[in-house]
Regions:
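A short tyrosine-centered beta-strand micro-motif
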Residues: 122-126
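Short beta-strand elements
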Residues: 132-148
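Beta-strand-connecting loops/turns
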Residues: 43, 119-120
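Beta-strand-rich extracellular modules
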Residues: 127-131
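Short, surface-exposed loop/turn segments at beta-strand-coil junctions that are enriched for proline
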Residues: 112-118
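C-terminal motif of bacterial Sec signal peptides marking the signal peptidase cleavage site
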Residues: 7-10
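Contiguous segments within soluble domain cores/interaction surfaces
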Residues: 15-108
Length: 148
């Protein structure tokens, strides 16, 4: 009977509590950025690969929403005109991707270039929205007429 009493003593309220930690992730775009610099043609699709990296551990068990967005605006007659933030005629938008800070895998955004898209210089912008803040980046792409 003595062993049972000692086993019960180990379960007393003075035992240490168990802590749980959750891994958080942050997103960046674009893993495939070097492939975005070639000339694009109407009818093609731009694929943006979002990647994740660990943002550390937390005891907070709540998942925090993150929205990943991408847009293409233009055309501009030149890179100088694009950088001057002049008016543009076209805005193409990828479907927003909704994830959380617990999403550990990469995701993909796609923007289809319409067949009637005018040639010129376009701004490809990416945005990460989380907890009321926004961060992002941009790159310049060129759309040229399709080759025969």
């Amino acid at each position: 009977m003595v062993p049972a009493a000692s086993a019960l003593a180990g379960c007393s309220p003075s035992s240490p509590s168990v802590s749980v930690a959750y891994e958080q992730f942050r997103f960046t775009c674009c893993v495939n950025s070097e492939s975005l610099t070639h000339a694009w043609h109407p009818g093609q699709s731009i694929t943006l690969q979002w990647s994740t990296e660990s943002a550390g551990m937390t005891a907070d068990d709540a998942q925090h929403p993150i929205t990943l967005m991408a847009t293409v605006t233009g055309p501009y007659a030149s890179v100088v005109a694009l950088k001057a933030s002049g008016a543009h005629a076209t805005t193409l938008t990828a479907s927003p991707i909704r994830v959380t800070d617990r999403t550990s895998g990469g995701v993909v955004s796609t923007i289809a270039l319409p067949l009637d898209l005018a040639p010129g210089w376009y701004n490809l912008a990416t945005t990460i929205q989380s907890a009321g803040s926004r961060t992002g980046g941009a790159t310049i792409i060129e759309v040229t007429p399709p080759t025969s």
